[in-house]
Amino acid sequence: MSWDDEDFDIPSNSKKTVAASWEDEEDDGPVLESWDVDPEEEEKKKKEAKLQEAKRKAELKAKEDAEKAKKDAKRKELEQFDQLDERTRKELLKKAELNADLNNAADLFGGLGVADDNDDDDFDINEHPRERITKQQLAAAAASKRPALTKDTPLEEHPLFQPTNKQEYEKLRKTVGTSLTRLNEDSSLLYASSLAVDLIRDLSQPLSVENLRKVISTLNVVIKDKERQERQARLKKAGGTATGGAGKKKAKPLARPNVGGGFKKDAFDDMDDGQFDDLDDDDFM
């Protein structure tokens, strides 16, 4: 038997396998061409772009806010500098010029560092020590200067209204008393009705009964003194005395005799005029 006479049937399942593979393959998604873009990928890219844009805007806003804060700090520093007295201002300007010269020298000798003009951080590694000291001195001088008082400034912020001992309380009393009593010259009616009476009442609220009696006794002394002064003023105006008497009446001048021609003479005067003859001794015989 030769090999040529034998028939070998070689089973081949390639077609069936391929067919089965195509039939079994299931893809619910749409078939995309080579130039089409996946919608999910596109949405993801849009979200990332939005996040990047929001981040960029936030950084830009933070940078603008930081620049604005620096400008405000510079402006406040200049305002505080303008409020300083002339002597302190000259000293600070002199120190600033000296520090500028030192910083220039530092640049020449290796760039030891000059602080950035727009840098207002508390500490800068590149800031010159002299310039840092100048800033500290300027801040201390501005802080020590008394702020200008306005009508809206609370009185509690004034050092005078922060007494801690007897001397400071007496100074407060004298200062406030003198300042308030001057208002009586402008309007005595408003001073009495809208200030003095109500102020005394308000100041007496925290006092104890014993201290209130002291206040009343003090006011009684003031009342008696005022009554005495007013009585003396009335008597002085009327020409009386300080003790309350009416005073001595002025003596009336004596009446001068009328020596004119119309004055009537009596009988004795007629005798002087020679109307009666001289009597002799024989007339009485």
UniProtKB/Swiss-Prot annotation:
Region described as Disordered: 1-86, 232-285
Signal peptide residues on this chain, from the entry's feature table: none
Entry's localization field: Cytoplasm
Compositionally biased residues, Basic and acidic residues: 42-86
Keywords from the named record: Coiled coil, Cytoplasm, Initiation factor, Protein biosynthesis
UniProt cross-references to InterPro entries, sorted A to Z: eIF3-like_dom_sf, eIF3j
GO terms (BP aspect): formation of cytoplasmic translation initiation complex; maturation of SSU-rRNA from tricistronic rRNA transcript (SSU-rRNA, 5.8S rRNA, LSU-rRNA); nuclear-transcribed mRNA catabolic process, nonsense-mediated decay; translational initiation
One GO molecular-function entry: translation initiation factor activity
Gene Ontology CC entries for this record: eukaryotic 43S preinitiation complex; eukaryotic 48S preinitiation complex; eukaryotic translation initiation factor 3 complex
Superkingdom to which the source organism belongs: Eukaryota
Bias (Acidic residues): 22-41, 269-285
Coiled-coil intervals: 36-81
Purpose of the protein: Component of the eukaryotic translation initiation factor 3 (eIF-3) complex, which is involved in protein synthesis of a specialized repertoire of mRNAs and, together with other initiation factors, stimulates binding of mRNA and methionyl-tRNAi to the 40S ribosome. The eIF-3 complex specifically targets and initiates translation of a subset of mRNAs involved in cell proliferation.
Summary of subunit composition and partner proteins: Component of the eukaryotic translation initiation factor 3 (eIF-3) complex.
Similarity-based family: Belongs to the eIF-3 subunit J family.
Name this protein carries in UniProt: Eukaryotic translation initiation factor 3 subunit J
